[in-house]
Amino acid sequence: MEHISGNSPEQVRERSAAVTGAVEESELKLSAVTMVPVESLLPSDSPRSAGEDVEHIRTLAASGAELPAIVVMPTTKRVIDGMHRLRATKMRGATEIAVRYFEGGEEEAFIFAVKSNVTHGLPLSLDDRKAAATRVLETHPSWSDRAIGLATGLSAKTVGTLRSCSTAGVPQSNVRIGRDGRARPLDPTEGRKLASRLLQENPSASLRQIAAQAGVSPSTASDVRKRLSRGESPLPERDRQQEVPAVARTPARVSRADGSWAPHTVALRHLSRDPSVRLTEDGRALLRWLNVVAVRNQDWDRLLGNVPPHCVKVIAELARGCADIWHRVAEELDQAGIDEAAGRSLSDVG
């Protein structure tokens, strides 16, 4: 997977300074209205896969109403927003049309066109909006799912699905730019590590400077500084646990390949046949839970090999939580067995 070079928050902000996620700012890039000959204008780079809607053009032409100014790229004279209005104006026989020029780049112009067709005029189809979002993902991979969703009329969840399905062709960035224009690291541990290095290299730097360079909030930079002053790791305990390398966990999976799970399988089979367990509601519930976790080693290898990369940390955390619960169950049962044995010993003495 190809990564973008120069992905520091500062560089990302420079690359997308004009489109920092607050898509509404693009509207400020429009010139005053001017009249332009209709024959001087070229068709748009339209997000509509089906092209123009002839019936909609006829409706606009027949309405007789004054149509809003269209938006045009000044350098190429291509229409960014308003092809239906341009066709309707020609159908009316007019030779000039009201135009506002867009002062921005080609990528910004496409995003403006998509957003314009989402918020007014003839709506884009769902397929067109998805195609537009995929294109924005390619040109602005550092934008957050919410920011792209705002521009294309899709939910953040849908954009996230498109991102995960198109990662092979989409350059990857280690930050996301939100709707507020702020760059945030995808992995907060990296931001904390960078803040730690910057603080050690330049102890006199202000927290705002450190936060801006590391792509973290000032409060996070402050927390890192406090941790360093106490001689602690810049990472909270929960993040340090997630950092355990996968290779360190591999032997635990491999060790089951020698059939060490077999005795547990036999024990579970005998337990399932025990009437005192299987003939009670609580016993059957316990058997269901035990059967869920009694997965063979080869099944684990298959399941773990198909976990989506973006779900690894979440599933690992859930697995640790389940392991903690079962560990506590085992300890309580062990203690119950000890207490019962002690009770029998006392009764024997008595």
UniProtKB/Swiss-Prot annotation:
GO terms for biological process: streptomycin biosynthetic process. InterPro entries: ParB/Sulfiredoxin_dom, ParB/Sulfiredoxin_sf, WH-like_DNA-bd_sf. Residues 1-20, 168-189, 211-258 are annotated as: Disordered. Residues 177-189, 223-242 have a biased composition (Basic and acidic residues). Keywords: Antibiotic biosynthesis, Streptomycin biosynthesis, Transcription, Transcription regulation. SUPFAM superfamilies: ParB/Sulfiredoxin. Disulfide bonds: none annotated. Residues 1-10 have a biased composition (Polar residues). Signal peptide: none annotated. This is Streptomycin biosynthesis operon possible regulatory protein.
